[in-house]
Amino acid sequence: MTKNLLTKDGQFVVGENKGLVYVLAFLCLALFTYGFIEAVLNRFSNLNASSFVFLIAFIASILFYRKGNSKRVYIRINSKGIYQDERLVTAWANFHNAYINQKEKAITIQDNFQLVVEFLKEGTTQGGRRNIPLTNTQNKSEEEVLEAVKFFWAAYKNKIGN
């Protein structure tokens, strides 16, 4: 799917999945509203631990809303190289390999995928490795990210004649 959209002069951008983030913000706000209405109907006389959970839901809704409005670009891949948060990780001339890895955590309910980029450090013969986290609310899948890396790497190799 992504391969058809990629061009040698274009770029591949990974940001937030705004629809998902706004749905999460709305659900948290609905949870807070339910708790607030219940507290008002009880005239704030019977506040308990669940009342604080509803307050936390309000804070979460604000955070999700701000995240949805963010213009942050997590990963940018183009003909020059791979960028993380608009900072160059490696140019294609120094690129060696990239793959998807899952960071192991003892207790978690979410995936912890990372894009692992292996490269030569600028001006040296030392290798480097950068683990770029792939969020659960990003607008591109792990497979699409890896496909974009392969596409631009192949385009670079064709450009230099390898």
List PLM regions with ranges.
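N-terminal membrane-targeting/pre-transmembrane regions
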Residues: 1-42
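Generic detection of short hydrophobic beta-strand segments and adjacent strand-loop junctions
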Residues: 8-14, 90, 130-134
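Hydrophobic beta-strand residues in large extracellular and virion-surface proteins
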Residues: 14, 75, 82, 98, ...
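Hydrophobic alpha-helical transmembrane segments
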Residues: 43-56
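Alpha-helical transmembrane segments and their membrane-interface exit regions
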Residues: 56-62
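Conserved beta-hairpin
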Residues: 62-97
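Acidic, Ser/Thr-rich low-complexity segments on the non-lumenal side of membrane proteins
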Residues: 85-124
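A membrane-cytosol interface segment of integral membrane proteins
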Residues: 115-162
